From Swiss-Prot:
One of its GO terms (cellular component) is cytosolic small ribosomal subunit. It holds the Pfam family Ribosomal_S15. The keyword Ribonucleoprotein applies. Part of the 30S ribosomal subunit. Forms a bridge to the 50S subunit in the 70S ribosome, contacting the 23S rRNA. One of its GO terms (molecular function) is structural constituent of ribosome. HAMAP family: Ribosomal_uS15_B. SUPFAM superfamilies: S15/NS1 RNA-binding domain. It comes from Oenococcus oeni (strain ATCC BAA-331 / PSU-1). It comes from the Bacteria. This is Small ribosomal subunit protein uS15. Belongs to the universal ribosomal protein uS15 family. SMART domains: Ribosomal_S15 (SM01387).
Length: 89
């Protein structure tokens, strides 16, 4: 259910701002989006898994806060990221 290390490394490589970057807002949002997508698939099959549902809501809230922060500090990076990830905003 969780992302494999290979998938996470691929996401980090794609969204990193420089070599060795694992903590930038873009990388964090991209990894959270992949986690959220996997949890959404899990929840569609397991509707009564309430602990996973709570984890999904926490991840969505964390991503929302990171996106709000990015929008406040740099609108161009924010718009690039949401278009690249295909998020509605």
């Amino acid at each position: 259910m969780a992302l494999t290390q290979e998938a996470k490394n691929q996401i980090i490589k794609e969204y990193a701002r420089h070599n060795g970057d694992t903590g930038s807002v873009e990388v964090q949002v991209a990894v959270l989006t992949a986690d959220i997508n996997e949890l959404n698939n899990h929840m569609s099959e397991n509707k009564h898994d309430f602990s996973s549902q709570r984890g999904l809501m926490k991840k969505i809230g964390h991503r929302r806060n990171l996106l709000r922060y990015l929008r406040d500090i740099d609108v161009a990076r924010y718009r690039t990221l949401i278009s690249k990830l295909g998020l509605r905003r």
